[in-house]
């Protein structure tokens, strides 16, 4: 009997021959088939997975590196096994032979391409309600969104359909679904992970990211992706200095989210963490100047460049015409036909607002001698599928996209690393995540801090799949 657990624990069991790789894969396949209603996957190849598992067992390699571990790759990432459709009809036949850099590193270490994760169409959205491929459902409550755009990966990891996964994060798309699904999501410093072989949104902001059961799994996968052994940084909570920029990040939270944040802060304070309540000057102003101007201007340009250079048999205009999700089509067509964001606005975002946003973060960390910043990943918990444009938040109707990405957006625009950790359940049993952000290129230390916080919180809740 195989009990599914984390990647690190699974590798240990495989090395100790507690079960074979084939037995592990059979257990995972059965679980995936039983949970097909979550619509987490666009493509699987169980025959190939079984064959590969048998070969690994025959050669006695199970548990060495990542050998035997199936991962879910978001459908905009080339794996060499599945089509890199980015969840849009126009790319349904796009199947690159060469895996993306981030996939190549993991597959070379022995990981198996377990599934292609369903996603928000072309990554431009946070609900994963894809009108072309169907909505991904949250394993905690199938009537709710899992977050996005890497919703399929997060749902698969939370439901233990796959042991871990790789998504992409432009402004929220790894950390938000991780938070709404009760798992760990890591967005590295921009440039830490390779971005080749990935259908893009905004090259300035895009990065692959890891979704996993726990922080040790993230540390393991991060080291493999970066091509170096994980750095053994042991961090004691006592003496850590963590910033609380309350005016922006703690404003207008759902009551359950606010309570969870207060509880976690008290737990860590009892561990002698020093909290510094101070705001980042002009954060909202600088972030607003970067966020949408950069993403909206770069989206059609980067997508067209990718299609022209890496996709055969279909043109950019054909891909655009085939888009099914109204929210994605409206944004893309508005930029293409009406020049929603002008070149001058884009240049202002890149040359003025983004450097000032980055400088504001740098000065904030330095002035207060901070190790990290702590805040709720999202101001609210998962909401019903279908509320793509507006959602009720604290009694008022608000823009769905803007409220869900509000807290995770600024550090994305600054290119900083962020780690979302599951910390609590709401009164109606939905996961709540807290994020820690670090300064640029502090990824290893941020992960070490996350590990220490994870151990202090000891979140053990899992969804029950029907």
Curated annotation (Swiss-Prot):
Enzyme class: hydrolase
Enzyme Commission (EC) number: 3.5.1.-
Catalytic residues (positions): 74, 149, 173
UniProt-listed Gene3D superfamilies: Amidase signature (AS) domain
Record keywords: Auxin biosynthesis, Hydrolase, Plasmid
Any GO MF annotation of the entry: hydrolase activity
Annotated pathway: Plant hormone metabolism; auxin biosynthesis
Pfam families (alphabetical): Amidase
UniProt GO BP: auxin biosynthetic process
Listed InterPro entries: Amidase, Amidase_CS, Amidase_dom, AS_sf
PANTHER family: GLUTAMYL-TRNA(GLN) AMIDOTRANSFERASE SUBUNIT A, TRANSAMIDASE
Record-stated family: Belongs to the amidase family.
Record function comment: Hydrolyzes indole-3-acetamide (IAM) into indole-3-acetic acid (IAA).
Protein name, entry field: Indoleacetamide hydrolase
Source organism of this protein record: Rhizobium rhizogenes (Agrobacterium rhizogenes)
């Amino acid at each position: 009997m195989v009990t599914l657990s984390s990647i690190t624990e699974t590798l240990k069991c495989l090395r100790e021959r507690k079960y074979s790789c084939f037995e592990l894969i059979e257990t995972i396949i059965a679980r995936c088939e039983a949970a097909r209603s979550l619509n987490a996957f666009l493509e699987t190849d169980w025959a190939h997975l079984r064959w590969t598992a048998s070969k690994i067992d025959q050669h006695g390699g199970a548990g060495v590196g990542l050998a035997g571990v199936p991962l879910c790759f978001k459908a905009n990432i080339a794996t060499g096994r599945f089509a890199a459709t980015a969840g849009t009809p126009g790319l349904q036949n796009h199947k690159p032979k060469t895996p993306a850099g981030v996939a190549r590193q993991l597959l070379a270490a022995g990981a198996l391409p377990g599934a292609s994760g369903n996603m928000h169409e072309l990554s431009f959205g946070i609900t994963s309600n894809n009108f072309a491929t169907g909505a991904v459902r949250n394993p905690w409550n199938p009537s709710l969104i899992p977050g996005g755009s890497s919703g399929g990966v997060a749902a698969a990891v939370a439901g233990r359909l796959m042991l871990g996964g790789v998504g992409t994060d432009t402004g929220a798309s790894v950390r938000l679904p991780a938070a709404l699904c009760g798992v760990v999501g890591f967005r590295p410093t921009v440039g830490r992970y390779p971005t080749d072989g990935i259908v893009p949104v905004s090259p300035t902001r895009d990065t692959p990211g890891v979704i996993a059961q726990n922080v040790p799994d993230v540390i393991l996968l991060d080291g493999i992706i970066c091509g170096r052994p994980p750095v053994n940084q042991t961090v004691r909570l006592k003496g850590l200095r963590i910033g609380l920029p309350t005016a922006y990040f703690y404003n207008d939270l759902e009551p359950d989210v606010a309570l969870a944040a207060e509880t976690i802060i008290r737990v860590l304070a009892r561990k002698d963490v020093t909290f510094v309540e101070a705001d980042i000057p002009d954060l909202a102003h600088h972030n607003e100047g970067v966020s949408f101007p950069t993403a909206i201007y770069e989206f059609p340009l980067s997508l067209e460049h990718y299609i022209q250079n890496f996709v055969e048999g279909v043109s950019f205009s054909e891909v655009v015409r085939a888009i099914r999700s109204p929210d994605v089509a409206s944004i893309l067509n508005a930029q293409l036909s009406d020049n929603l964001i002008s070149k001058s606005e884009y240049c202002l975002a890149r040359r003025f607002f983004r450097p000032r946003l980055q400088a504001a973060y740098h000065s904030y960390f330095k002035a207060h001698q901070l190790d990290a910043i702590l805040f709720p990943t999202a101001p609210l918990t998962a909401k019903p599928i279908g509320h793509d444009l507006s959602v009720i938040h604290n009694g008022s109707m608000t823009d769905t996209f803007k409220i869900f990405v509000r807290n995770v957006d600024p550090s994305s625009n600054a290119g900083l690393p962020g780690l979302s950790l599951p910390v609590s359940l709401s009164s109606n049993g939905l996961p709540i995540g807290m994020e820690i952000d670090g300064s640029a290129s502090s990824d290893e230390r941020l992960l070490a801090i996350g590990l220490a916080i994870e151990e202090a919180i000891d979140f053990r809740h899992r969804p029950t799949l029907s």
